[in-house]
Amino acid sequence: HRNVVFKDGGDKACQVRPFSAMDSEDVEDLWAFLARYERRTDGQVLAIGHNGNLSWGRMFSLTDYNYDPITADYAQRRARWEPLYEITQYKGDSETHPAISPNDEFADFERWGRKFTEGEDREEFEEEKRGEYVRAALLRGLEQEVKLGENPFKFGVVGATDSHTSLTAASEDQFLGKMPTNAPSPFRVSDLGAAKFAASGRTAVWAESNTREGIFDALSRKETYATTGPRISLRFFGGWSYEQDDAFRSDLSGVGYAKGVPMGGELSLAAKGQVPSFLIQAQKDPLGANLDRVQVVKGWYSRSGEQHERVYDVVVSDGREIPSDGSRVAPVGNTVNIADATYTNTIGDGELSVVWQDPDFD
């Protein structure tokens, strides 16, 4: 399903009857409803796709509701009305899956979706996962842009809890489960499925003002990111002229906007021989654990029609060095005491900043 967000107040939103699955299960009918709303009220609205890690490959399918191949018109409308997608929530994240990111040691974090089972067709299983997870969807979008002239999966990401209890806790110390039966009670132990859920899902928005309008505008331009719970502060800019010293400027965000575009933006075309640079800063949750590293995941669609993915460590903590061959750094360590569910901040860093260039840019 989709979550629908209105920029406007009740004076406009109440002019239409809410659209639901009782009206239609075809997402194109929802898009038509959103278009009618904007024409009728001169308001603004957008839809956010629900975490699709249990969608059996349908969330990012290359066919429509009737199983016909998607068209350029379909792709254009999906990108128009669904600029964001929910990448994480209580039932796990939908960034990627070990089956389709086998070289990413973190790909199995808080995994809910089923794993490959013996006797199953591996190619069919992997194709199903590509229709459920974000990284694969972004690559599919690049492929469809070549084939259709439009990219249906050109979205930013958000996080949410998807709580079914009205208690939207994203922190472990406040987590009471996803369903009413997960809450503390004499019957809680009978719901063994509750162990699969995890506190998760925050959306961070770089808005110009803390108002409904300001937040909606930031959502629309995709200047957002998601975390699995920690209140990590992240800045990410792309440009052609960032310098290493920019990563340590007190006005880092000002430099970021002046020299490039923020997360969700589009870089201008490169001049011949130019290599893009990325200005990145991550700060830990003030009440949370230190940071191990910052990674950049690169996906590209080759001239031969193949999809590729590579994960880069771009800055790491505790004075460690990234090997010149690009191989990844071992984890910083682990101070977790499983017996009492505590940790100490004796390893890692509170802030990591870098200007990074892709050493393999073509």
What do these predicted ranges mean?
Residues 1-7:
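Hydrophobic or amphipathic alpha-helical targeting/insertion segments
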Residues 10-18:
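Substrate-binding surface in catalytic domains of secreted glycosidases
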Residues 12, 35-45, 51-65, 70-362:
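C-terminal functional module detector
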Residues 20-27, 104-110:
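Conserved, charged catalytic cores of large soluble enzymes
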Residues 24-28, 132-135:
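Conserved phosphate-coordination/catalytic loops
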Residues 25-30, 67-69:
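Well-ordered, non-membrane alpha-helical segments in soluble/globular domains
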